[in-house]
Amino acid sequence: MQTDRKTVLITGSGQNIGRGIAHHLAAAGLNIIINGSSNRDAAESVADEVRTHGVTALVVMGNVGNKTEAETIAKTGIAHFGAIDVLVNNAAIRPHASFLETSDEDWQRILDVDLNAAVWLARMVLPAMVSNGWGRIISFSGMNAQRGYPGASAVSVAKHAVWGLTKALAVEFGPSGVTANIISPGTFPGDDPAKASDPKFTKLLNENPTRRLGTTDDIGGMISYLCSDHGGFVNGQMLQINGGVVMQF
């Protein structure tokens, strides 16, 4: 299937922030590749939702932390749409254990999902992006990963490495019309009012300069901008979307 619309692959898009990103990009006119690792029903539900925007949605299940599966996800999307123009590396795992209690197997599993998946998928989608003279690669970090994630050292390592990858891709592929950026979200309890009002979030809310917590619209709106032609001069940046809890200078 060939299409004049741009196509985005959003990993981990069967729920939460990934689902919100899918809605925003569908509203902007992009075809959507929904990916999940286990819950096909949830992924199919998101696909049905985004089709209401008049775009084509394809569900491709698979674990991006497995190289073969990650490559198959990309190949399936490319075969269906002709190319993947936007890659959003949203899938992540954040198991908690002290540094000394983290096994080699768990360490590798975290790095495979949180870091290596971004490498494997970039290698799959970049050739067409370069050939077409346009592309967007968007990844995620996080406030805790930036600070040093207590009880999740492997996550901090992976997210810092993705930041390095982002800068390297921005420099190498910028001349070809491909941008690479990374988003560092703040506290995002989701769009469920009951969940957002949970007492455990009260302290975080009161400490935020905006006196609120993040919603999927905050993330989706930024990614929609980055994927537009107006966002083409934003490249190699870490974008803090946290209401001012973490500031750069």
Label the predicted regions.
Residues R147, T202, E207, S224, ...:
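Short C-terminal tail/terminal secondary-structure segment
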Residues G174, T179, V234-G236:
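Short, small/polar-rich loop/turn modules that mediate ligand/substrate recognition or access, typified
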Residues A122, A158, T166:
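Active-site helix of classical SDR
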Residues P175, I182-N208, D218, Q248-F249:
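A glycine/serine/threonine-rich, flexible loop-to-helix segment
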Residues S98-F99, D106-L111, P193, K200-L204:
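Substrate-binding pocket helix/loop in short-chain dehydrogenase/reductase
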Residues G14-N16:
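Conserved glycine-rich cofactor-binding loop
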Residues P127, V171-E172, G232:
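Alpha-helical segment proximal to the catalytic Tyr-Lys
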